[in-house]
Swiss-Prot record:
InterPro entries: Oxoglu/Fe-dep_dioxygenase_dom (IPR005123), PKHD_C (IPR041097), PKHD_hydroxylase (IPR023550), Pro_4_hyd_alph (IPR006620), Pro_4_hyd_alph_FE2OG_OXY (IPR044862). Transmembrane segments: none annotated. This is PKHD-type hydroxylase Pnap_2559. Binds 1 Fe(2+) ion per subunit. It holds the Pfam family PKHD_C. GO terms for molecular function: 2-oxoglutarate-dependent dioxygenase activity; iron ion binding; L-ascorbic acid binding. Keywords: Dioxygenase, Iron, Metal-binding, Oxidoreductase, Vitamin C. Its EC number is 1.14.11.-. It comes from Polaromonas naphthalenivorans (strain CJ2).
């Protein structure tokens, strides 16, 4: 399931994030890639322990905490701490790859299974040319280039790339989620059921049917979830 989360970050958050990034200590992004991905990765990334990274991580986590749609779609169990990257100049693309299935959290014994990938765009599409996040799925190739503050969720199993940036710089935050429900098809069904229950309640209030369907939702979640 590919899903857009509009306005995850506020204009004030974005202004503060870009001010931090203007003086940030960018490093070669290949240092954090797997063996296969490092061969096609050519971007810059912030160290995980720098001030700008920690501040933007806090902004993103606050935005996620305030997004019921994120929780409905992702059903998060664990999350890899958000990272920040930049594309432009001589470090301007990331070729086709699939993310590592398991990521080790820095300075922690924790491991995160990468069921879902998330990218949060930190500057507007007009600031740069190219830089589309291109995701291959069963419906064909999806190209994603969203306004600043918007985010996209997509399956971690997807073959994807970032197209070359030919003007300006593309700034983004990215991370992975281990879901309570491992299968993308199952998460999609639960999300669609949850969203339609919400619409039914908005239109008709609580009824015997919405109560019964809510029970169905939770019984499916109980059947599929791994805690």
């Amino acid at each position: 399931m590919l899903l857009t989360l509009p306005n995850l970050l506020s204009p004030a958050d974005l202004l503060a994030a870009r001010a931090l990034l203007s003086a940030a200590p960018w490093a070669d992004g290949r240092a954090t890639a797997g063996i296969q991905a490092a061969q096609v990765k050519n971007n810059e990334q912030l160290p995980s322990d720098c001030e700008a990274t920690r501040a933007i991580q806090a902004m993103v986590m606050k935005g996620l905490d305030g997004s019921p749609v994120f929780f409905s779609a992702a059903l998060p169990k664990k999350m890899f701490p958000p990272r920040i990257n930049r594309y432009g100049g001589d470090s301007n693309f990331y070729g086709n790859h699939v993310d590592n299935a398991i990521r080790a959290v820095p300075n922690s014994p924790q491991r995160v299974r990468t069921d879902i990938s998330c990218t949060v765009f930190l500057n507007d599409p007009g600031d740069y040319d190219g830089g589309e996040l291109t995701i291959a799925d069963t419906y064909g190739e999806q190209r994603v280039k969203l306004p600043a503050g918007h985010a996209v969720l997509y399956p971690g199993t997807s073959l994807h790339q970032v197209r070359p940036v030919t003007r300006g710089h593309r700034l983004a935050c990215f991370f992975w989620i281990e879901s309570l429900v491992r299968g993308d098809d199952q998460r999609r069904l639960l999300y669609e059921l949850d969203m339609n229950l919400l619409r039914l309640r908005e239109r008709h209030g609580e009824t015997a049917e919405t109560t019964a369907l809510t029970g169905t939702y939770h019984n499916l979640l109980r059947m599929w979830a791994d805690t």
